[in-house]
Structures are given as C-alpha cells and as structure tokens.
C-alpha cells in the first residue's frame, strides 16, 4: 500500500495521470519542491497550489464552482466556461489528463483535494495554453453523475447534457451539446475607408455595411475508462462535432477614381459546414515507485465545405467553392521520474497532417505537414531557491516543391527565490515556435473589393518567439493576492498580413515579418474585502513594435488593456459583473481595437437547480475601431458597432445530480488538432 501511495503522489507532481488519494500531510512532505506556504496557497517555482476550506467546499455546487474561487479565475457567464480575468487560454487537467469544463462539473466539490495553477506551463503544454490547471481529486463515488445546462437568449441559445457512470474499475461518460446563433433582425454595423494607389491611379473607397452571422453547432462524445490506481490506466474515447456557420453582408459604397466619384453597392456571403470526428486511445503504466510511462494517440478528420460569394456594382462576381478534407494523427510518449525534491520528464510528440483541397476553377491542392518534438524538463529546490529547466527540440516541415523543413530549440529557464512568507520573486526565460495554419500556406484567394483580394502564401514558414519576464507575487491569505511583472517578448519571422501589389491588384497576403516585439508591465489583483464580495482586475501597459524587413521602417504604439470583474453572494443569490476596456493592439500592420466583454448576471440557487438572467453590454455599446499603421501602402480605417450584443438578454437553467459510493475519476482527450483548414473570410 505504501508503494502505491508514493507512486500516485509522485505522478501528480509530474502532471501524469495517476490519482492523488493521500492525506494532505503526506502530500506536503513529499512535494518538497514547495518554496513557500501561506494560508491556503503553496508557492512553487512554476505554479501555486490551492487548498480549500470546508466553508468553500460547502458553498460550491460542483468542482468547477470550487476551482473558480482561485484568484484570477472566474466562470464567464457569457460563454459558461472557466476563464481568467484577461481571457487567456486555459488547459484543464484532471489528475494530469486533458479535460473540459463539463468533466470538471461532474466532479463533486468535496472530491477535489487541491488545484495546481501553472502560470508558466510545463514544457509539454507550453504550446497549448497560457495557463494550465491540474485538478487533483480523491476517488469519485461509484454510481451516477450528471449535469444539464440550457440558455435561451436573443443572440444565441445553448444546451448541453453530460452523464457518467462509475462501476468498479470502469467509468463510462456520455455528453451531448448544441449551440445556436440566431438569425436576428438586428445587424452589426461598420463604416470604413480604403485609400490606395494602383498603376498610377488613386483610389478612395468609403463604405458603410451591415453584417450578420448565424448557424448551429452540435457535438457528442463517449469515453470508456478502465484502470487500477498505481498500476495502469486505459481510456478509449470518441467524439463528433458538426458546425454550420453562415454570414451575410450588404455594403454601400462611395467610390472615387482620381477624384471622379461613383456610387456602388456590394454583397457578400459565406457558408461553411464542418464535420469533425476524433478518436483517442490513452494508456499509462506505473513502472516503479518513482517512474511512470504514458502513451497517447489521437486521430482527427476534418471535412469542410465552404461557399463564399462576393460581388460589387461594375465588378465581376467572385465565387469561392472549396472542398477540403484534412486527416491528422498525433502521437505522444512520455516518461516521468520523481523523487523527493527532484522531478524529470522526457517525451516525444509527433503531429502529422494531410490536406486535400479542391477549389473550383483552381484544381486540387495537396498539402502535407509534420511537426516532431523531443523535450525534457528538470526541476529542483535548494533552500529558498528553486528552478525549472526545460528544452524542446522541434522540427516543422511542409512537403512539396514549395515546402520547408525548419529545426528549432525551445529552451525555458525558470528561477524563483523566496523573500519571505508573503513575497516571492521569479525570472522566466523561454523560446517557442509557431507553425502557419494550413490556409496561411495556401494560394487560395477571395475578393475583398474591386482590385483587392485576400490570399495565403506558400512560402511562409514558422515563427520563433523569445520571452523574458520578471514576476513578483504577494499574498495575504483569502484577502489580497497581487502578481505583477515586467516583460520583454520578441518574435522573429512573425506571421502577419502584408499589403502586396501583384499585377493590377492589391493582395492582403500572409508573410513573415522581420520581428515583432512588446515590452511593458502587467498587474493582476484579487481583493476580497468581505466574504460576500470579490473584486478582480488585470491591467497591462505594453509598447508593441513591428518591423516588416531588416532595413525597413519600424512602427511602435502603446496598448493599455483593462479587465475588471466583481461578484457578490447573498444567501442563494449571486450577482456578477464583468467589463473589458482597452486601447488598440498592434496586429500586423493594423492597430486593432479590443473587442470587449461586458455583462451583468444574476443567479438564484435552489437545491440542485440554478436559475439565471443575463444582460450583455448593459451600459454601453460594443464599439471599436481599426486602422492601418502609418507606413502601410494602403490606408484602411473602420468603425464597428456589434449591435447584436448590445442589451442582449438571456435566461439560463442548470441542474446537476451526484449519486453513488466511492471509486475513482475520469479521463478525457490528451491531444487535439484545432487547425481545420477553413479559409479565413
């Protein structure tokens, strides 16, 4: 029994999928990589570990509500998902295995022992998310667990059902979901201006347009798990997704050629249907008291049908009729070792994709890509000083005459020093690569307006980013959490949309910039003045710079995003408010306004039921503006009002149940392919 206990705890440290079932005192003793403990939070070199009080567990309906009490986390009432204040990408792990919000909801709050919050993801997950949450549970109950969520609103409606059954060493989970974006009478509005020169002529293109999007999404999945804690774990899972998204746009144009004015009109539509089946096989074996081996294979298939149409007065009609089929396989093998205050992980991941694209009028294009990665990571502690060192060696390739093969290292160094019980200082240095999307490497094009198109570029290659960050943390338990940092990030070969003149037309074409950089500061504060009130703010100041070529002109600008969240609880009632403010962020050759989040949400809980009412953008309209940088050869300015969100009301009902007696928890997919190959309209 002692051997099994040590194995499960060691594996939890390494984020490998073994069940943590031990008393907190044993965990605290074994996890000697801890550098500072203050109240309910234990600080480590790359994460904070959160433990929960009996009152917090009692107040939470399910596991997700409990996890959302961690500083910098919340449940976004608009999307009904776990989120950070700034909306960073989150990867949820349950006992080390990639999981979903739904998986977390199916776990009773009383079964969560602790949560590791990685603000610096381990090397294995570095390219998957900004934040990693590893939820460590005790054994789940044998029996049934289920949840139902529905939302009915003016802009969209949503529903999902999840059910799980645990019996002996087996667990079966089934889920179904549907999302419906309504075709409303309210349209989003945009005004804009294009100014450019072409062939000695001067063009000015002013327009006002209205646009609306609608569609439906369906998903379902089944997963079977069989395993013995401390010995082996096998999971076979399959899921299926169907998406149909439509767009319609009407444009009214004042056109001028060398000062001669004309009035025109234009229409555009886009209809995309995607089917995506996925199958995953996961196996894990405990080799000894200190080592574990894991293998995972994921197969995904995308089937896309895309029909896009654009037309303007006095211009030819442009029709995009695209049929694409993409198949991919991702395989991973990981070995982990952990003993006392030392941990080591080593692994290999290979991702291989094949896309067959049939574009009407252009024939068939075959694209084959591959991404192979070897990585290792070591961490340890010496007194008040802790460190984590990792290295990934990666090769990105695209086959064919216009293909490429690029090799890159992605090292990470993380150092931490304990100043005292409430203060901690860390230094992060790392590098990573990003692969272009399939359609960024495609020559397919779509008409934007007369003499203006968008297209990919077969010659683009992967980009490499370098980050440096000095992080300071301060904690008064269950009262005030502050994290602030100063950072400098630089990306070589940055992927962006360039303005390219080709013949008698302009193209918005994917290219690699010489460099993109940002330097600045960020501060995240969570303040709990009273038990019933929680306030959160995430604010940044960044100086962003882009330089297209080594000898070209650079453009710099400041970006000041602010994210606010407030929540209050009185008995069975809860009120939450979320607001986003910000200036313009630099996106390639555009200064783009930050699309905002704003809502008020009121909920009432009764037994296993929860009833809610929401209003999106109750105080102001969702407006933002975009404009090209000063040296861009084309001037493009837009003002957008997303009227479909303004004062949008929705009502929610959710229900959950948990019945049974002791057993263990569930698993979900480990790897995934999210690049469908659909053309960006």
Tell where the protein language model's regions lie, with residue ranges.
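Short, acidic, small-residue-rich periplasmic hinge/interaction motif at the N-terminus
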Residues: 21-56, 77-78, 119, 124
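N-terminal periplasmic accessory domains that precede
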Residues: 33, 63-66, 80-83, 102, ...
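Extracytoplasmic beta-strand/coil segments of soluble accessory domains associated
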Residues: 64-98
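Short acidic/polar hinge/loop motifs at secondary-structure boundaries
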Residues: 69, 96-122, 220
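Outer-membrane beta-barrel translocator/receptor signature
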Residues: 126-133, 141-190, 215-218
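Transmembrane beta-strands of outer-membrane beta-barrel pores
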Residues: 150-154, 178-182, 240-246, 285, ...
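Face-selective signature of the C-terminal outer-membrane beta-barrel domain
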Residues: 217-245, 267-411, 418, 422, ...
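Outer-membrane beta-barrel signature, preferentially recognizing the C-terminal barrel domain
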Residues: 423, 433-483, 490-491, 508-519, ...
